[in-house]
């Protein structure tokens, strides 16, 4: 459920090169009834304006495959762990 995801201390995010790609990802994932949130891109990842999709690590493979199959261009995938007030961010390999 999105409310659980909102308060999660461990999650993944997809980043996109353009807002249009993020909006397309949102549309695709909504059509799949996926559990996700659209959030501002974390400063630890990028200082430019942008949107990211936040989701549970358990759904990484399925959501990534669905986005690729629907021709959504994903720029990066990151694992995020909250440590107090800071985020520990690890870039994951696109496959």
Question: Where are the language model's segments positioned?
Answer:
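C-terminal structural segments of small proteins and small subunits
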Residues: 61-95
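Amphipathic, hydrophobic secondary-structure cores in small proteins
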Residues: 19, 30-68
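Terminal low-complexity, poorly structured segments
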Residues: 1, 47, 88-90
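Short, surface-exposed beta-edge/turn micro-motifs
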Residues: 9-12, 48-51, 75
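Context-gated lysine
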Residues: 24-30, 54, 82-86, 90-91
